[in-house]
From Swiss-Prot:
<dbReference type="GO" id="GO:0051082">
    <property type="term" value="F:unfolded protein binding"/>
</dbReference>
<dbReference type="Pfam" id="PF01430">
    <property type="entry name" value="HSP33"/>
</dbReference>
<feature type="disulfide bond" description="Redox-active">
    <location>
        <begin position="229"/>
        <end position="231"/>
    </location>
</feature>
<dbReference type="InterPro" id="IPR016153">
    <property type="entry name" value="Heat_shock_Hsp33_N"/>
</dbReference>
<dbReference type="InterPro" id="IPR016154">
    <property type="entry name" value="Heat_shock_Hsp33_C"/>
</dbReference>
<dbReference type="GO" id="GO:0005737">
    <property type="term" value="C:cytoplasm"/>
</dbReference>
<keyword id="KW-0143">Chaperone</keyword>
<keyword id="KW-0963">Cytoplasm</keyword>
<comment type="function">
    <text>Redox regulated molecular chaperone. Protects both thermally unfolding and oxidatively damaged proteins from irreversible aggregation. Plays an important role in the bacterial defense system toward oxidative stress.</text>
</comment>
<dbReference type="GO" id="GO:0042026">
    <property type="term" value="P:protein refolding"/>
</dbReference>
<dbReference type="InterPro" id="IPR023212">
    <property type="entry name" value="Hsp33_helix_hairpin_bin_dom_sf"/>
</dbReference>
<feature type="disulfide bond" description="Redox-active">
    <location>
        <begin position="262"/>
        <end position="265"/>
    </location>
</feature>
<comment type="similarity">
    <text>Belongs to the HSP33 family.</text>
</comment>
<dbReference type="GO" id="GO:0044183">
    <property type="term" value="F:protein folding chaperone"/>
</dbReference>
<keyword id="KW-0676">Redox-active center</keyword>
<protein>
    <recommendedName>
        <fullName>33 kDa chaperonin</fullName>
    </recommendedName>
</protein>
<dbReference type="InterPro" id="IPR000397">
    <property type="entry name" value="Heat_shock_Hsp33"/>
</dbReference>
C-alpha cells in the first residue's frame, strides 16, 4: 500500500467478515516529537491498529477511544479514532520502561477502557481487566463480554524500510448470523499465518489472496487512514477562559506569555496580554484566526 488504508472484506461462504489495515505513516506521525521507550512505541502501534480496526466496525458516525491506564511506569496510553479513520494518540510515563517490557510490566495493576461516542446519541464505555498478554487478547475479551461476537485481532508491529510500521487484521462473526465455530476457527488459523512484512509492504489484495486463495472473498473499496489532531487556537482560548482573570494574569506576568502545548501533535499555541484582551472582548473568537 502506498499510504495508510483500511480494507473491509466478506467471506461468501461463511457468516464472517474481515478488515485489513496498514497504518505505517500514521504510526510514525504519532511517534514524532516523542522520545518513547521502544516497548511503549510498540504498544502504541498495537493500540493504533486495534483502534482503527474497531472504529471500522461502527455503524454510525462517531469515534472510539482505546485507553490503557494503571499504577505502573506507563500511567496512560490512549488512541482516539473516528469513523473517517482520523487517528491520534499519546502516552504518559512516570518511571523507566525496559526494552521488551510486557503489557503487565508497563501498566501494572490497570485496565483497558473502550469509549464509543456517537455523533448523535449516548456515549458507551466498556472496561476490561488486563487479563490477556497483549492488547489484542484484551480486546477479544471485550468483544466476547460486551458484544458476544467471536472476534479475533491479528496485530503486527516492527520496521519497514528503516521506519516504524504497524498493521493488522480483524475477523468477526456477522451479527445475527449463525456462523459455525469450526468455520471461524479455520479462517482464524489461516489469518494467524500472516507476517508483518507482508502487511507492511504488499497490496492488500495480494495479502488476502495469499491467506485465503481457496476461499471466495469479496473485497470492498478501501478507506484512507490518517493522523489528524483536533487541537486549535480557538479551543485553547476557550480553555483559558475557564480560568479566572487573576490566574491568567499571573501566568502572563510570570512568563510574558502563555504557552499551551498539544501532547498529541506537539503544536504550541502562544498567547500574550494583547491576545488575552482580544479573547475577553470577543466571545465569538473571530480575532483568534
Amino acid at each position: 500500500m502506498a499510504h495508510d488504508q483500511l480494507y473491509r472484506y466478506l467471506f461468501e461462504n461463511y457468516a464472517v467478515r474481515g478488515e485489513l489495515v496498514t497504518v505505517n505513516e500514521t504510526y510514525q506521525r504519532i511517534l514524532t516529537n516523542h522520545d518513547y521507550p521502544s516497548a511503549v512505541q510498540t504498544l502504541l502501534g498495537e493500540m493504533l491498529v486495534a483502534t482503527s480496526l474497531l472504529t471500522a466496525t461502527l455503524k454510525f458516525s462517531g469515534d472510539i477511544t482505546v485507553q490503557l491506564q494503571g499504577d505502573g511506569p506507563l500511567k496512560l496510553a490512549v488512541i482516539n479514532g473516528n469513523h473517517q479513520q482520523q487517528m491520534r494518540g499519546v502516552a504518559r510515563l512516570q518511571g523507566d520502561i525496559a526494552p521488551g517490557s510486557s503489557l503487565k510490566e508497563m501498566v501494572g495493576n490497570g485496565y483497558l477502557v473502550i469509549t464509543i461516542t456517537p455523533t448523535e446519541g449516548e456515549r458507551y464505555q466498556g472496561v476490561v481487566g488486563l487479563e490477556g498478554e497483549t492488547v489484542a487478547e484484551c480486546l477479544e475479551s471485550y468483544f466476547q463480554q460486551s458484544e458476544q461476537l467471536p472476534t479475533r485481532l491479528f496485530i503486527r508491529t516492527g520496521q519497514h524500510e528503516g521506519k516504524q510500521a504497524a498493521a493488522g487484521m480483524l475477523l468477526q462473526v456477522l451479527p445475527a448470523q449463525d456462523a459455525d465455530r469450526d468455520d471461524f476457527d479455520h479462517l482464524a488459523q489461516l489469518t494467524t499465518t500472516v507476517k508483518g512484512e507482508e502487511l507492511f509492504s504488499l497490496p492488500a489484495t495480494e495479502v488476502l489472496y495469499r491467506l485465503y486463495h481457496q476461499e471466495e472473498v469479496t473485497v470492498y473499496e478501501p478507506q484512507d487512514v490518517e493522523f489528524r489532531c483536533h487541537c486549535s487556537r480557538d479551543r485553547c482560548a476557550d480553555a483559558l477562559m475557564t480560568l479566572s482573570d487573576q490566574e491568567v494574569n499571573e501566568m502572563i506576568e510570570q512568563d510574558g506569555e502563555i504557552d499551551m502545548h498539544c501532547d498529541y501533535c506537539g503544536t504550541h499555541y502562544l498567547f500574550n496580554s494583547l491576545d488575552i484582551r482580544a479573547i475577553r472582548h470577543d466571545s465569538s473568537g473571530n480575532l483568534l484566526h
